[in-house]
From Swiss-Prot:
PROSITE patterns in the record: RHODANESE_3
Active site: 178 (cysteine persulfide intermediate)
S-adenosyl-L-methionine keyword on record: no
Species in which this protein is naturally found: Pseudomonas syringae pv. syringae (strain B728a)
Signal peptide location: none
Known EC number: 1.14.-.-
Residues of the Rhodanese domain: 124-218
Chain's gene name: trhO
Region (Disordered) residue spans: 293-312
Protein name listed in UniProt: tRNA uridine(34) hydroxylase
One Pfam family of this chain: UPF0176_N
Reactions catalysed, as given in the entry: uridine(34) in tRNA + AH2 + O2 = 5-hydroxyuridine(34) in tRNA + A + H2O
Principal EC category: oxidoreductase
Function of the protein: Catalyzes oxygen-dependent 5-hydroxyuridine (ho5U) modification at position 34 in tRNAs.
Length: 312
């Protein structure tokens, strides 16, 4: 029986002053262990999602933990039958998750971590303001009962949203969550700096909650968007029902795929009327290449990760 692919989401806020020099040996460690996916490294830490065999993931994690600064790096695992990534990359960044606010440093100041088993009790408190720190397209697929949707299109918009809608003097308790924990951890650091006193965030993010909390006890509704070819996951981190439009990157449901405006690899109901003719023709050609490669049982370099050029 073919062994499932292990998907590992990992991050750690830690000062990596030599992150530029770290890029090449990290990339080599990924290659040596047969790892696909992308890792981001910056002065503030490391972040990314990778995939590979059981032995490959164990080998990469052992390599990372051989660095004393990363010895306690945590990662969350799930499984899939097909390789969710096609490339192996290590990217140098200013931030491992981009908030765009100078001085925010989770290495120095961060909110209170809440274990998944304790999360339901916290968010059931009527005095707690529950905020989803993810982007609008992620929230539309699933979120926690009673959570506020900031309707942001990028994490950079989060600080302005907080300033415009909430007051530390009024909103005494704030709880936040995101996919794997990294965005809400950084958001908690930002909010503490803005004067909010009681700031909580879900340790391990939604993924850890879906893994550990039984579905019958869950306050989660819907599916959770993930940044790989699975698109979404459900409780127990099994693959969800959504696909993704390669034109606009919007998650698409079975209903979307039944629409007359859906064409695999070309358009969906969310973008069919906004694509230029040039982009549409390019997408049609690309899709033909993918289908031809599939018919020949050959991998195609764009595969499900293909993204059409921006219309901007």
């Amino acid at each position: 029986m073919t062994q499932p692919i292990v998907v590992a989401a990992l991050y750690k806020f830690v000062t990596l002053s030599d992150y530029v020099e770290l890029r090449e040996p990290l990339l080599q460690a990924m290659v040596d262990n047969g790892i696909k996916g992308t890792l981001l490294i910056a002065d503030e830490g490391i972040n990314g999602t990778v995939s590979g065999s059981r032995e490959g993931i164990d080998g990469l994690m052992a390599w990372l933990k051989s660095d004393p600064r990363l010895i306690d790096i945590d990662h969350k695992e799930s499984y899939c039958d097909e390789q969710p990534f096609y490339r192996t990359k290590v990217k140098l960044k200013k931030e491992i998750v981009t908030l765009g606010v100078e001085g925010v440093d989770p290495n120095k100041s961060v909110g209170t971590y809440v274990e998944p088993k304790d999360w339901n009790d916290l968010i059931s408190d009527p005095e707690v303001l529950l905020i989803d720190t993810r982007n609008d397209y992620e929230v539309s697929i699933g979120t926690f009962e009673g959570a506020i949707d900031p309707k942001t299109t990028s994490f950079r918009e989060f600080p302005e949203y907080i300033k415009a809608h909430f007051d530390p003097a009024v909103h005494k308790k704030v709880a936040m969550f995101c996919t794997g924990g990294i965005r809400c951890e950084k958001a908690s650091s930002y909010m503490l700096g803005e004067g909010f006193e009681e700031v909580y965030h879900l340790k391990g993010g939604i993924l850890k909650y879906l893994e550990e909390v039984p579905e019958q006890e869950s306050h989660w509704r819907g599916e959770c968007f993930v940044f790989d070819n699975r698109v979404t996951v459900r409780h127990d981190l099994t693959e969800g029902d959504y696909d993704q439009c390669h034109a606009c990157r919007t998650p698409i449901s079975a209903e979307d795929r039944a629409s007359e405006h859906y064409s695999p690899g070309v358009s969906c109901p969310h973008c069919w009327d906004s694509l230029s003719e040039k982009t549409r023709r390019s997408a049609i050609d690309r899709q033909k290449q993918i289908e031809l490669a599939k018919a020949r049982n050959q991998p195609h370099p764009i595969g499900r990760n293909y993204r059409l050029p921006s219309e901007a």
